Amino acid sequence: MCFVVALLSVTISAKAYDYVTFDNDPAQARRYTLANGLTVYMSRNAEKPEIQTMIAVRAGGQNDPLNSTGLAHYLEHLMFKGTHTYGTTDYEKEKPLLKQIDDLYELYGQTTDPEKRAAIYHQIDSVSYLNSKIAVANEFDKLMSMIGATGVNAYTSDDRTCYHEVIPAGELRRWAIIESDRFQNMVIRGFHTELEAVYEEFNMYSTMDRDKVMLAVNNILYPNVPYRQHSIIGTQEHLKNPSIKNIRRFYDNYYRPNNVVICLSGDLDFDKTIAIIDEYFGQWQPNPTIENYETPYQAPLTQHRDTVVYGKESPEVWMGWRMPDITHKDMDAIEVMESVLQNGKCGLLDVDIDQRQRMLSVGAGALAGKDFTTFFMIGAPKEGQSLEEVRKMLLEEIEKLKRGEFSERMLQAINANERRNEMQSLQSNRSRANKFLHSFIYKIPYEDVIGELDRKAAITKEDIMRVANRYFTDSYACVFKQQGEGVNPPKVDKPKITPIDMNREAQSQRVKELSAMSADQLQPQYLHFDRDLSRSTLNNGQELLYVQNKENELFELDFCIEKGTHQDPSLSLATDLLSYLGTATMTTEMFKSDLYQIAAEAGAYASANETHFYIYGLQENFQKTLQLLEEWVLTARPEETVYQEVVADRIKAHEDSKLDQRSCFGNLRSYGTYGKKNFRRMVLTPKQMKKLSGEKVLTRLRELIPGMCRVTYYGPMREGELKQVLNTQSKLVAQGSRDAQIHSERIQPEVVKKSEVYIAPFDANTTYYVGYANWGEVYTPKDEAIIRLYNEYFDGSMGSIVFQEMREARALCYTSAAYYSMAGHKGENNSYITYIITQNDKLKDCMLTFDSICNFMPMSQAAFEQAKSSLLKSIEKRRYVRSSPIGSYLGFRDKGWDHDLFEDIYREVKNLTLEDVQAFQKQHVANRTYRYFFLGNEKEMPMDFLKTRGSVRRLKIKDIFVY
């Protein structure tokens, strides 16, 4: 039930605002609707002095014109370019130039002759350069930095375009001024360089096989739905022939208040907030004739259809069924059915396939949409297994589901776990805002959104069987993803772009006005080691770090041993094996089912330098969960066949990872940074694994337990009671010994003494590149402030030097970075990193630009002041909540700090100047000796140029993967 209330805000406005509240809403949300149709959701959560903001338009890729695919996504990029009042020094002078660019692009799109197109593009480039002298690049982001906003970004999906950030609680008014301006007065500028950045994004995703598979499924299930025939980014043809007029038409139609929702959650005052929203968004004119998306008719499939997709990555089977839209009455049952199939513990796929090691990996899930829902089943074959065998196993599980071969008890457990997840999500402002967004975009009444758990609790076994039999028919799409040479987009040469003027020192009048506006300044709050967490010692010498949860009944408990795969590569094999085992008295299925029944999690993992055992869940089940964890860790006994299957799967997964561009690059980067002895190469070879046994690797894991050094807890239990339980009942704690505690030596990154070039092969349209420099400079606390300020100034936002020079001015990439990397532990070395993903023929330009800006850093007092303000504001709104005091304390301690380092940083940054940043850059960044890493197609790299950078070392993929 919802209630309508009239609100009179006498302190801000004499205007009355009606709002709606909702029964049984844990977020205690309010929904307002302004006179122009703008919907506003709010929820108050005063845990931190910040507000999660989302402004979402009910239009996305499905609304793209047929001749301008990717338009919604491209408009999302252009929304960051400014308005009539910011992003320009004189909009009236800009207008004729922008009009000329509009007209040239229309002509460009209508021209097919290559020489004529090149001539028109040259004109576009020339006029764009002239316009850049009037425009001010990235003023939107500079404004967001000014108010201390973080997480400033946006995304486009099929049915929405969402713009989001987190702002300090005292900056709501300035935020509303900035955002209302761009949603009402957006100006399209910086078009040709941003288009090239989007094309780089297209290149990056075109190497990913899963996008190709998704499109293949859609081609079968939805042949008449245009937006499902291409990615959100659009087709290559349309990206290269854009129409600014079409983009503006889209903006004018959909970016209207009656088609937009504002979602706010955080430390806000309802009355003041709605008055501010109305003041700045209330004049926005609605569109009574919005062109809504109409779902084309899709004839039902009468039988399944198979197709094959080829690509570099490992083989998989993807099966897709067409199901009803997200608002359909069957969706609750379909979503519960999803958990019956797979929930990570005792679903049909978990028990029958994963725990029995019948596939390399398996997954299931519903991708719900406005028009249809696609239910996917995905399987990856083991070595020697055919894709047809994988399909057969997946279909067998569907048949079991349809026959009802699962227990009612599982449905109760699914609901218990969803309620625990709901309790966790309520702690997140982002999760709250996303619920509001979900309600608006899909036109689902919010009371139905918050009533979802109760409805799902009433779902019966018969309901699951009914929807399974209704929708899991023979009318499905099946894509066999085979390894091989796929069809990739044709390569397109880089356009000739004159670097545009960044106009760094210029400021629009709007920026000056907003800079002069006062805002409520937050006071920083620092972590007090003796107040915000408790530090004590258990009877057997382990350190206990404790924070009490006073908000809900959730707990987290972690046992830490300071030894990981750097010291013993078999530890990751042991924890992997453990995940397939039960206990001395319970099968794997029984053990995982018992955990799921009480909505608890238990696990083990080994990182580079630590091994952890952990549990989390509801406090009422704390001791039961602890008992299950310890019985599992201490008594699990593997059958040798289980161990051999784990080994075989690890070998297969290792081989498959060599086919993935991002995975290969991660290994190359680790190899170049640490040498042969690095985390990603700290794996056992097939011969080494086969030489061991399940019993031996578990013994190695258990032999570490006496060396456990630390236990951390966050939860409702009082500290004294917790210590009593751990000291008297915990078998893991009982095995501990002060004398046996382990503190392993960490592997250090290599010092770069001479310039080198490492090249590893990967055939793609893009090259992944890193420049790594390490002079052996040891981390010292006194450098924290200047390093953080340098990084913020140089590459901290979309208004920073790196973003502007690499992307805005030259359109060399979609993503890039350059930063001074501080060591995470006292006594370790700092390093310097440059990073980019770029089209192959732009690589030389990227490196030369990095040389220029890293060696001769552009100086801008205005940019410096914005970076400084942003850094200070980020510290002012920083709060230590829930379990974060524990992690922050450990991070500070690792670095050698005996108090909150941000207290020193805040004090010191206030006194730093641009000249200090320049001096740091000259001493610690300029003229570095680099080790360069490249993953890509060497035939398309500028090898003569790369040879001037250092001796070239060609690596094989097996070199960076051990075997």
Go through the PLM ranges and name each one.
Residues 13-42, 269-309, 315-316, 351, ...:
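Proteolytic maturation boundary segments
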Residues 1-11:
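Bacterial N-terminal signal peptides
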Residues 199-211:
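Carboxylate/His-rich catalytic cores and anion/metal-binding grooves
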Residues 181-188, 280-288, 395-406, 631-640, ...:
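A common structural junction motif
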Residues 43, 48-61, 70-72, 88-181, ...:
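M16 family metallopeptidases and their MPP-like homologs
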